[in-house]
Amino acid sequence: MNYNSTQNAAEVVSAAQAIAQGISKDGGLFVPQSFPQYDEATLRALLKEDYKGRAKKVFSDFLTDFTAEEIDECVEQAYTAAKFGGANPAPMAYTKLGGKALNVLELWHGPTCAFKDMALQILPHLLTKSLKKTCDGKDAVILVATSGDTGKAALEGCKDVEHTKIIVFYPVDGVSPMQKHQMNTQEGKNVTVCAIKGNFDDAQTGVKKIFTTPAISEQLAQNNMLFSSANSINWGRLLPQIVYYISAYCDMVNDGKLAFGDKMNVVVPTGNFGNILASYYAAQMGLPINKFICASNANNVLTDFINTGVYDKNRQFFTTTSPSMDILVSSNLERLLYKLCGNDDAVTREWMTALKTGGKYEVTDAVKEEITDKFFGGFCDDAQTKDTISRLFKEDGYLCDTHTAVAVNVYEQYVEATGDTTPAVIVSTASPYKFSKAVLQAVAPDAALPETEFDMVDMLNQVSGMPVPAPLAGLRDKQARFSDVTEADAMPQYVLSALGIV
């Protein structure tokens, strides 16, 4: 199977090239030229597989230039019980709210306690194999812009992996204290972390600009290096996310929560659009999904887009209690638009150019109609998020983080608006302990909060009785290794300096 750019369909590459390169030279994103089709027999066979078996099937269908042995190696190295605390790295949890069942897909049992581990534990292995196939002898320089979770997960996945170097940029005031400490204490001889003065969109724009500046790429090439990305613009990041939607469906059927062949809804807290896009791609393969429910916080650019067909990033930016969704430019939406406009690269390029130059574009009526047919967009503010965490904990003792609470709240809005009783999978993207202050304020509103986030973790543990994940429990005593801060427009110079090129 080959891949082409969303902005130049003539730019065709293999899977290994797409993963190694990360982004197309024209600035477009790589997408599969077709989708494998999973019929009833295929899905029934996957019911009998464990998570690794399901992953191997999906990877083998998309990565046709990888051998079965190579895929086995990647999957076996990534999804170990030691890293994820059990044989199933993405277990279902069943709870209730308002007397109604909630089926929660918990994606935060990995080494950094966030859903990004599901992709970033395997991406470095896919990347090193891709480099051997396409760019023998070159080292990959992985640039990451993060709103919180991606940075730590990418650092952890890439640390000390041969022939890779990783540089992570995060907004200086746009991540939680826990996330900042996780990144700045990162171990590994091939890792660099730097804060930027600005928000996530500034960081992401800076990384994209570095990727698409030929002079910088030439300097790397002269030093036997090339750029790649661990953000969800990289196909190697997006592909592993398809797996857990298929696995969730199989687990729901096996657990008696869904009849085989019946449709389910998916509810995804959404920032950069990669996670919900993976569910859409799973549906393109034949997974029976009825509705894609896109949950946003106060930065509700996606809600407005789904409801109006107009994408407009020219609006106030809010710093919220769900910082991984504090995003106004959702990069992976480009892939959806390319699919919905009939794989028309010229139209996609026109919209993306309008976004870059004026911060706004409007899709055609036909695309708008398809989006409103398949997607539901809703948002909630910090007060609603807090209330949802509180209600869920009071009713069933289930503790969730702020991003998951946004998804639950928007799902309630959806059910109220539509009356749809289709079983839904709520995607839970982070451990509540990663956002202990906001969660504590919800479940123990009258308690005096301790000064440090680590003391808040201890207090949340006492209030909830939920065990503190081991990776977070051991973080308190780690010393920070990184403290650099740079201007957004100085990012190119910082990268070259960090690599020892200038």
Where are these regions (language model features)?
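PLP-dependent amino-acid enzyme catalytic core
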Residues: 1-502
